[in-house]
Amino acid sequence: MSISIRRAKPSDIETIQQFGSKLLNFERENYDASLDSNWALSDEAKAKYLDAIQNKYVIIAELEEQPIGFLIGSIIEPKASDARQIKQAYLQNIYVDDDFRKTGAGKQLVAAFKKYCQDEGVKRLNVSVLAANEIAIKFYNTVGFKPRSLSLSQEL
């Protein structure tokens, strides 16, 4: 079973929207009922995903030419007004279909993004994860992420 990673193309938009919907649905059902899993299928989401394909780093994991997952990431250039003057990247979304988890696809997606970031001179890679999502936290720890900051929120 050989998984390949490739850059996304505009023709992948429906696949990316479906993966995005599955990701939001999983997070809504398990961690945050305020999420709208149908948003990923909207015209607004389509426009954002197309923009990401053209202006960010979007990759697809495939098994025998069938898409099984995706990752969206972006590079953040420091602004002159920033106290921290290092080039950073942000892993925005990662999803692997249920049937293909534990195959290494997620690790390969992250490894490809890390290499891209290193080639672009990025010094720090960041990701945010829901605190209750212990599976994702364990995965991110496995691929080298460590806790750096803590974000707190309060429902009103």
Q: What feature does the model see in each segment?
A:
Residues 1-14:
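Conserved N-terminal entry element of GNAT/NAT acetyltransferase domains
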Residues 24-48:
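Conserved GNAT-fold acetyl-CoA-binding loop/helix
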Residues 48-60, 90:
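A short helix-loop-beta-strand connector motif used in the catalytic cores of GNAT acetyltransferases and
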Residues 60, 66-75, 95:
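Conserved beta-strand in the GNAT
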Residues 84-98, 150-153:
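Conserved acetyl-CoA binding element of GNAT-fold acetyltransferases
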Residues 93-96, 102-115, 142:
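Conserved acetyl-CoA-binding loop-helix of GNAT-fold acetyltransferases
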Residues 107, 131-149:
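Conserved active-site alpha-helix within GNAT-family acetyltransferase domains
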Residues 117-128:
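Conserved GNAT acetyl-CoA-binding A-motif
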